[in-house]
Amino acid sequence: MEPLRLADAESLLSETSVIPLTPPAQTPEAYYTESDDETAADFLVRMGRQQTAIRRRRRQTRAAGFVAAFVLVALISGGLGALMCWLAYR
């Protein structure tokens, strides 16, 4: 078994490596500074509302996906049933 060796700088960075120069941008609603007129409690209330909206949107998307999947299964089932009837009675 070969001993583990530490990665050197050349193996970590290559010509195709992409290193972001700035951190990923946050949504403008998700910041809090003491200099704002907003208190910490107001910030937490706002973040709670945002998280509730995100959860609601996720739930609605999941429900729409289930409905679409159910409709697709029903259409496939109906199509196969029609095909079987057509093949059986022709």
UniProtKB/Swiss-Prot annotation:
Any one cellular-component term (Gene Ontology): virion membrane
Keyword Transmembrane helix set for record: yes
Keywords on record: Host cell membrane, Host endoplasmic reticulum, Host Golgi apparatus, Host membrane, Membrane, Signal-anchor, Transmembrane, Transmembrane helix, Viral envelope protein, Virion
Region Acidic: start-end pairs: 29-38
One record GO biological process: intracellular transport of virus
Positions in the Virion surface compartment: 85-90
Bilayer disposition of the protein: Single-pass type II membrane protein
Short sequence motif Di-leucine internalization motif: positions: 12-13
Transmembrane spans: 64-84
InterPro entries the UniProt entry points to: Herpes_US9 (IPR009278)
UniProt record similarity statement: Belongs to the alphaherpesvirinae envelope protein US9 family.
Function as written in the Swiss-Prot or TrEMBL entry: Essential for the anterograde spread of the infection throughout the host nervous system. Together with the gE/gI heterodimer, US9 is involved in the sorting and transport of viral structural components toward axon tips.
Name used for this protein in its record: Envelope protein US9 homolog
UniProt organism field: Cercopithecine herpesvirus 1
